[in-house]
From Swiss-Prot:
GO biological process: threonyl-tRNA aminoacylation
Organism: Saccharomyces cerevisiae (strain ATCC 204508 / S288c)
EC number, UniProt record: 6.1.1.3
Any one Gene Ontology cellular component term annotated for this protein: mitochondrion
Keywords, sorted A to Z: Aminoacyl-tRNA synthetase, ATP-binding, Cytoplasm, Ligase, Nucleotide-binding, Phosphoprotein, Protein biosynthesis
Biased segments, Basic and acidic residues type: 11-30
Record GO terms (molecular function): ATP binding; sequence-specific mRNA binding; threonine-tRNA ligase activity
Catalysed reactions listed for this entry: tRNA(Thr) + L-threonine + ATP = L-threonyl-tRNA(Thr) + AMP + diphosphate + H(+)
Residue numbers carrying Phosphothreonine: T297, T381, T460
Regions annotated as coiled coil: none
Protein name per the record: Threonine--tRNA ligase, cytoplasmic
Keyword ATP-binding: yes
Ion transport as UniProt keyword: no
Residues with PTM Phosphoserine: S195, S289, S453, S457, S605
Length: 734
């Protein structure tokens, strides 16, 4: 043994001690914690991080020097309650105003609005001397406050992805229920074009959340800076994604903003919360893959979703909500109840199994029954049309990428993504008179839309679906009354399901077609109809379709989630494009007018509505809609014949009934029926066979299981018929 080896051996002996020894080496907790923190960050960190910071600091100093030279003038800040506060331009901020009101208010704020524009709380006011500036202060309870809070949380995630994974981040917006960030992650980020893609998985979440925790603890300020296109291209030279966005979104000679928090500097219009310390609870939820800008011809990216709150109690409540939503997931229930399935041989196209088809047909029958009462005529139209039709309608120029197209005999055809052009052809097929209007035409035709495979999700995002689609051709004078009729229709259908709903009137957007006078008149009619209706509605300014104003209807489910299903749209352009006309009431027999076209759907997509209803009812279908209404269970082999007789009577009366003739125990049969959510289980034995009766177990009255009195078959048929016809949701026989 060499001298050096002997020395090493001796050192090892000194370190070898028994567990019971008081001299045992104790772990250094501080060192371990430091080591753990260091392992969260790449070493060395990506070079672009320091390059960005150096450039940002230099440009920010130039900007601050410029602001320092700006003249200070007095401003009048008008709060929402009418109170007026004094301020100084380029010095006073919305946060200063909030602190002057109360510290508790300032501490809970997310963002402000200055003259209707979202504005960073720490950004000074700008304006002319003595100018009145309207100020709104928004906290997390407001929709806009939530969006800003989650947008800022996305930046925290972006910083984590850069520092922990070396990712090239792309887009990181807020969503209706949280936020996400898209990114490219490779095995080697030095040559992103050559390195293989690295998948982000939930195994990466602890590390990402660890960095996020540090970012939040450091209370990193969100700093805004306006940069020229030239400087932006220099700052983001390392990222082909950011470079593309700058080149395509920022005009030559133009400028836009970036925001910094800690080591992250990102292309962003903002605004943001004051600092990351406002985030008290942060959690990553799921991951998926996507394409850059949603285009399948672009690079495949990784997407990580998260949620955050300004209060840990809100996070606890949200996670509880997610657990409940998971139990109600229509994909889970659809599999358990054998309602539908999907197969890779036809992505995004639902295979409706027998029990799911029962639900589907019941929904369609509900609409058909109402159509007869409300003066609608049902039609059937082709599934594919020559591209010339789509050129006439305008869809070829604006919607072609969302269509499935193909060649037939050297002509280009497309599967229809909507029914309206076909209905226009029907209207134009012969001369029409004012006496025929309003003409209400309904269509359950199959529609195809070319959704990206990564966006497909159960019944809520599909490629093939059917709508309860209808179009009303009417005169301008009939618009208001037709809208009122649709409101009544909505109220009835949603009342059957037990949905609460609200409406939004979306008015003329910046880019529109047609005359302003026509728009104003149409919006006035819609607003008048909404006021007469008297329900919950608000104006969504500037969000109308380019061809006409619209009303969007949102329904609230059992989990208080809002879904947009129904829509009412006024269309002045398709009648023009198809040159639709009707003989007017004018005495001049050669006088013709253009009809107005109202696009209308109540369920929307039948597929999506089925998903919403599945989760709303948690698979416990109301009797009239249930695919499994009654299960007949004999207590023994001797009573199987009678059980089959009862089942046949139920079937002949139009009910969905089954009989369990398996060799399982009575308890097992009942349990199986309960798992499949049969509304009623009829137990039959000696007494029931002799009395021609059944013993009823109600799915929704668990405390009475096994204690129910027997009811004659004739009486129960009558009670079931009433329950079905009344479309009640209480599942109670009377």
């Amino acid at each position: 043994m060499s001298a050096s080896e002997a020395g090493v051996t001796e050192q090892v002996k000194k370190l070898s001690v028994k567990d019971s020894s008081n001299d045992a080496v104790k772990p250094n907790k501080k060192e371990n914690k430091k080591s753990k923190q260091q392992s969260l960050y790449l070493d060395p960190e990506p070079t672009f991080i320091e390059e960005r910071i150096e450039m940002f600091d230099r440009l920010q100093k130039e900007y601050n020097d410029k602001v320092a030279s700006m003249p200070r003038v007095p401003l009048k800040i008008v709060l929402k309650d009418g109170a007026v506060k004094e301020a100084t331009s380029w010095e006073t901020t919305p946060m200063d105003i909030a602190k002057g009101i109360s510290k508790s208010l300032a501490d809970r704020l997310c963002i402000s609005k200055v003259n209707g524009q979202l504005w960073d709380l720490d950004r000074p006011f700008e304006g002319e001397a003595n100018e009145e500036i309207k100020l709104e202060l928004l906290d997390f309870e407001s929709d806009e406050g939530k969006k800003v809070f989650w947008h800022s949380s996305a930046h925290v995630l972006g910083e984590s992805c850069e520092c922990h994974l070396g990712a090239h981040i792309c887009l990181g917006p807020p969503t209706d229920d949280g936020f996400f960030y898209e990114m490219a992650v490779r095995d080697s980020m030095k040559d992103i074009s050559e390195s293989p893609e690295r998948t982000v998985s939930q195994a990466d979440f602890p590390g990402l959340e660890g960095v996020a925790k540090n970012v939040i603890k450091q209370k990193q300020k969100f700093e805004r800076l306006v940069m020229s296109k030239e400087d932006l291209l220099k700052m983001f030279h390392y990222s082909k994604y950011k470079t593309y966005l700058v080149q395509t979104k920022v005009p030559d000679g133009g400028a836009t903003t970036v925001y910094r928090c800690g080591k992250l500097i990102d292309l962003c219009v903002g605004p943001h919360i004051p600092h990351t310390g406002r985030i008290k609870a942060f959690k990553l939820l799921k991951n998926s893959s996507c394409y850059f800008l949603g285009d399948a011809t672009n690079d495949s990216l990784q997407r990580v979703y998260g949620i955050s709150f300004p209060d840990k109690k809100l996070m606890d409540a949200h996670l509880k909500f997610l657990a409940e939503a998971s139990m109600r997931d229509h994909r889970k229930i659809g599999k358990e109840q054998e309602l539908f399935l999907f197969n890779e041989m036809s992505p995004g196209s639902c295979f409706w199994l027998p029990h799911g088809t029962r639900i589907y047909n019941t929904l369609v029958d509900l609409l058909r029954t109402e159509y007869r009462k409300r003066g609608y005529e049902e039609v059937i139209t082709p599934n594919m049309y020559n591209s010339k039709l789509w050129e006439t309608s305008g869809h070829w120029a604006n919607y072609k990428e969302n269509m499935f197209t193909f060649e037939v005999e050297k002509e280009t055809f497309g599967l229809k993504p909507m029914n309206c052009p076909g209905h226009c052809l029907m209207f134009k097929s012969r001369e029409r008179s004012y006496r025929e209007l309003p003409w209400r035409v309904a269509d359950f035709g199959v529609i195809h839309r070319n959704e990206f495979s990564g966006a497909l999700s159960g019944l809520t995002r599909v490629r093939r679906f059917q709508q309860d689609d209808a179009h009303i051709f009417c005169t301008h004078d009939q618009i208001e009354s037709e809208i009122e009729n649709i409101f009544n229709f909505l109220q009835y259908i949603y009342g059957v399901f037990g949905f609460e709903f609200k409406m939004e009137l979306s008015t003329r957007p910046e880019k529109y077609v047609g005359k302003i006078e026509t728009w104003d008149a149409a919006e006035s009619k819609l607003e008048s109809a909404l006021k007469k209706w008297g329900g919950n509605w608000e104006i969504n300014a500037g969000d109308g379709a380019f061809y006409g104003p619209k009303i969007d209807i949102m329904i609230s489910d059992a989990l208080r989630r809002w879904h947009q299903c129904a829509t009412i749209q006024l269309d002045f352009q398709l009648p023009n494009r198809f040159e639709l006309e009707f003989k007017s009431k004018d005495q001049d027999s050669e006088s013709y007018e253009r009809p107005v076209m109202i696009h209308r759907a109540i369920l929307g997509s039948v597929e999506r509505m089925t998903a919403i209803l599945t989760e709303h009812f948690a698979g416990k279908w109301p009797f009239w809609l249930s695919p499994r209404q009654v299960l007949v269970v004999p207590v023994g082999v001797k009573y199987q014949g009678y059980a089959e007789d009862v089942r046949n009577k139920l079937h002949d009366a139009g009910f969905y009934a089954d009989v369990d003739l398996t060799g399982n125990t009575l308890q097992k049969k009942v349990r199986n029926g309960q798992m499949l959510k049969y509304n009623f289980i009829f137990i039959v034995g000696e007494q029931e066979m002799n009395e021609k009766s059944v013993n009823i177990r109600n799915r929704d009255v668990m405390e009475q299981q096994g204690k129910n009195a027997t009811v004659s078959v004739e009486e129960v048929l009558k009670q079931l018929r009433n329950l079905k016809d009344e479309k009640r949701g209480d599942n109670v026989l009377a």
